[in-house]
Amino acid sequence: MTQLPGLLDTEAIRKDFPILDRQLHDGRKLVYLDNAATSQKPRQVLDALSEYYERHNANVHRGVHVLAEEATALYEGARDKVAAFINAPSRDEVIFTKNASESLNLVANMLGWADEPYRVDHETEIVITEMEHHSNIVPWQLLAQRTGAKLKWFGLTDDGRLDLSNIDEIITEKTKIVSFVLVSNILGTVNPVEAIVRRAQEVGALVCIDASQAAPHMPLDVQALQADFVAFTGHKMCAPTGIGVLWGRQELLEDLPPFLGGGEMIETVSMSSSTYAPAPHKFEAGTPPVAQAVGMGAAIDYLSAIGMDKILAHEHAITEYAVKRLSEVPDLRIIGPATAEERGAAISFVLGDIHPHDVGQVLDEQGIAVRVGHHCARPVCLRYGIPATTRASFYLYSTPAEIDALVDGLEHVRNFFG
């Protein structure tokens, strides 16, 4: 068995994830390498969900009965856990959403309806990058179409990194918001946050960071990032689906208008007007994802007990080993950084002339789960002249043996189509 420095005790960790014991085609054991799409859930999270539904299920806030008070305490307790996990200065800066896409749409719409000095209009500019997930492209396209603002973006270098050579021309005095991904979901690139934030601050632009591929894998400190907004999702970090987070600076959340209206987000309502509750409730209209938030709190407890630094070290070792092994496969081309340095735990590649969907299907027959397609990042595929990629992505329970299984599987793919 391959031994790598920095690995976690995956034998013990994998016992917490019941699904990893599944056997698929012809009794083949599941090799789950699709963690950038969603992670598997540990028993501790599953138990927390069952406990909530079996003992505490009620709608939150305003209720005076025992179940409502218990549900509210669990829901707001999850907010406290998120705030501590990302080192937020205040729990009131943590907004629960249904996913990162909703978080990013929330920012775009807040700015679209805002008063000065935050309002995006026809005289202002929005900056994104060519490596964004569609969830950090389409909301800004919609905002630009609605307001007349100009949408600009950073391009990509041949090795899958942001081209910041023209940063002063892209981010200008007209820029209202710069929104970019911390870790690319398709390229795996870890972006140079400090340089982008510094330039944005020079011109007085706001900064929004999509941390969906960062929060599950590395320590996330919103104060150190010096951003104005940070968005991420729960289902990629051992939490259930249906729960996301938007962190925003307190003074911004106080000044910016709500996007969705309804129950809970109000202070007073009359037939002629309404006033709004303080943040974060101003941005959480209607019944929130209570059970999902409880599950996210349990996921944070689980990850924190292991340690995000240790998870990062484990994944770096796995990614480094994967880059090495994949580089040995004939006709395989990694899309993105060719080394594990400044790279997250996802590797996209093409295998000769074999279509990625064919690669994925043959791998699936061997029990190996990868993701194929453009990964909701089609501009990246257009940039590199490819229709799609195969993506293998790793997490705290990934093992060197699974990388070996992937490489063996790819050899089988080559022989199958050879």
Language-model-detected regions and their locations in the chain:
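Pyridoxal 5′-phosphate
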Residues: 1-418
